[in-house]
Amino acid sequence: MATSGRLSFTVRSLLDLPEQDAQHLPRREPEPRAPQPDPCAAWLDSERGHYPSSDESSLETSPPDSSQRPSARPASPGSDAEKRKKRRVLFSKAQTLELERRFRQQRYLSAPEREQLASLLRLTPTQVKIWFQNHRYKLKRARAPGAAESPDLAASAELHAAPGLLRRVVVPVLVRDGQPCGGGGGGEVGTAAAQEKCGAPPAAACPLPGYPAFGPGSALGLFPAYQHLASPALVSWNW
């Protein structure tokens, strides 16, 4: 084995092979490595196969022309709630009394009458129309069998059912010589009928229910300033 001043532990020195200069050795260029596929890029390529790109999707799913089909705007929930919730109109006491008075006179109003009443009460014709519709419905429901009537609706129903019961009319009676004049030759017959009906002398007026009966001379007794006038029963009528 050839010894040298420098110990070498290479394979050639151990096998006693001649050393070759490193400059004369053929250089081996590194073989180009094939680029390894990036897993992220492979995943993106696979996803693109399932889903179209932005350009392709814009072509495929492009909406139709606005001129051919009107675009429907989604209604917001707030606007729907505002439409459902209508503001309740509060009528004043004077307006309510006038509406009730007119309802007792006339349940159905024509368009000119509604406009006239609305301008009088400073309301709109629609408000007057709705008030009359609601009041007719309440009155109809109150008249249904087994329904509890409110005082206002009951009074309104009584006014329409029997208007003559709430009005009393006093008919004047002409008296001649202490006897009522019935006109024509039937004075005695009328006097007898009045006595049988009223059970009082003909000079006394028939008392009405709820009113006290006054005699022939007691009418002027209520007014002391007119007591000097003669009693109506003593005045003789010249026919």
From Swiss-Prot:
Gene Ontology terms, MF aspect: DNA-binding transcription activator activity, RNA polymerase II-specific; DNA-binding transcription factor activity; DNA-binding transcription factor activity, RNA polymerase II-specific; double-stranded DNA binding; RNA polymerase II cis-regulatory region sequence-specific DNA binding; sequence-specific DNA binding; sequence-specific double-stranded DNA binding
Subcellular compartments: Nucleus
Key word Nucleus present: yes
Bias (Basic and acidic residues): 21-32
Compositionally biased spans, kind Polar residues: 1-11
InterPro entries: HD, HD_metazoa, Homeobox_CS, Homeobox_NK-like, Homeodomain-like_sf
Record SMART domains: HOX
Family: Belongs to the NK-2 homeobox family.
Protein name: Homeobox protein Nkx-2.8
Organism: Homo sapiens
